[in-house]
């Protein structure tokens, strides 16, 4: 008779413990119920990127002096700078500038150390293509400014999400 009573008590304790664990999990779930959703409907809604966002690099051909500082500070020696020395004026003339975004790690060193500020980071992050060779941008492709997410009328931007006040 005594083993049957102890088994019944153990069963009751296990049932109470299981109910407590289920209740704790349910309380955690309910604490998340009053939060706003994090996901967005991507092609139709886009988050506005921060000022410090490191997207595609924009290049201004006229400002570049072909000093190759960007190549030296790049951890993977990525920018390809072709130049020709003009002997009559003793200056370099830039012929070609290209960056392969399939290899670029978007560290921003080239932008930070450029002495003439001819490189800048944009908010463009949609660089996906079917062919990896299309990610090799020359100076013409790098010079195009992307359409701003803010200016695109087809997309609803989510900038300031209302905060829920806990009282």
Curated annotation (Swiss-Prot):
Organism (species): Nicotiana tabacum
EC number: 7.1.1.-
Keyword set includes Acetylation: no
Cofactor binding: number and manner: Binds 2 [4Fe-4S] clusters per subunit.
Catalysed reactions, semicolon-separated: a plastoquinone + NADH + (n+1) H(+)(in) = a plastoquinol + NAD(+) + n H(+)(out); a plastoquinone + NADPH + (n+1) H(+)(in) = a plastoquinol + NADP(+) + n H(+)(out)
Protein name: NAD(P)H-quinone oxidoreductase subunit I, chloroplastic
Domain 4Fe-4S ferredoxin-type: 55-84, 95-124
Taxonomic placement: Eukaryota, Viridiplantae, Streptophyta, Embryophyta, Tracheophyta
Subunit structure: NDH is composed of at least 16 different subunits, 5 of which are encoded in the nucleus.
